[in-house]
Amino acid sequence: RGTQSDGHDFIPDAVAKGASAVVCEQLPAETAHGVAYVVVPDAAGALADMAAAFYGHPSRELKLVGITGTNGKTTTATLLYDLVRALGYKAGLVSTVVYKVGERIVEATHTTPDPVRLNAMMREMADEGCEYCFMECSSHAIVQQRTRGLHFAGGIFSNITHDHLDYHKTFAEYIRAKKLFFDSLAKDAFALTNADDKNGRVMVQNTAAGIHTYSLRTMADFRCKIVEMHVDGMLLRIDGQEVWVGLVGRFNAYNLLAVYGAAVLLGLDRAEVLRAMSMLHAVSGRFEFVRAENGTTAIVDYAHTPDALENVIQTIQEIRTPTQQLIVVCGCGGDRDRTKRPEICLLY
């Protein structure tokens, strides 16, 4: 059963169109001759298991890293993809903006696609020689078991703030959804969590994976300090080494530190990782600068939560000149979490 309709209602249509087998949670009132009916306790979970098996468990042939959290998933996943490519490796990417099999672009339909499409893409990645895959794991996808049956080399937790309460109903349920991802990691995987988020430790408290932390404020396995921030980039000190990066904002310092930590945990050389980080650039639609001919500078960002928008505004305040006027235009998508809209308006 889905959130909008019951899949059992469509069994007759599927049979009429030639389905020879039906996986369901309960037998329909009328069964068709010559059609096999397999009753399972959880059809969504069964679909994920079947998809992984049908495509030969391609995730086992990749170093798959899942990124979950309210903000920063797309940037972290994309930067990891760009980083390993800069180091000479082939990789795949599954993100809100785009799916990539090596360098081939595939149109993205969801942050995390359904298990059949997901495993089909990973089979293409493995067959085309990709060694890594970096994937956003949305809370919807985790609860709906789209990531079930996948073997993750590691998972990253960015942060958790007010979002998706239209679906999860309560913040506690939203936290639980994110935590389920880390609960499912195997003991040979790593769980990299943001120690500066008050729920960072909660996320990994029941995981079997090796736990690692990153922080800008406290003791952690991976630490970072912003030395300088300018309109065209930042000077960061990571693990005692300074590196200039072409991204701006404290939130991006967290994203970059997560990228560094994950790369090291994947076995990449620290010095080579820092060198590659200096070549990274902002992700499309994430604090992206657009300069008009009249001298006006626009910054396009996906910020759609109170916390994300506040971070963007704060970063702009830090880098703009005293004479520059700040005008904020923000939209909230329809049929989604309405409770965050008043909080967003209060930021103005």
Show which residues each predicted segment covers.
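Phosphate-binding loop of NTP-binding sites
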Residues: 46-195, 199-207, 239, 257, ...
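Generic hydrophobic/aromatic pocket-lining and core-packing "Φ" positions
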Residues: 11, 81, 122, 178, ...
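Active-site regions of enzymes building and remodeling cell-envelope glycoconjugates
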Residues: 33-41, 106-109, 208-213
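Nucleotide phosphate-binding/pyrophosphate-handling subdomain across enzymes
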Residues: 230-231, 236, 241-347
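N-terminal leader/targeting and accessory segments in enzymes
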Residues: 1-49, 198, 220-226, 242, ...
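Short internal beta-strands
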Residues: 20-26, 191-195, 327-330
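Short, ordered loop/turn segments at secondary-structure junctions
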Residues: 26-28, 96-97, 139, 160, ...
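Beta-strand->loop->alpha-helix junctions that form or flank phosphate-binding loops
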Residues: 22-26, 41, 208-230, 246-250, ...
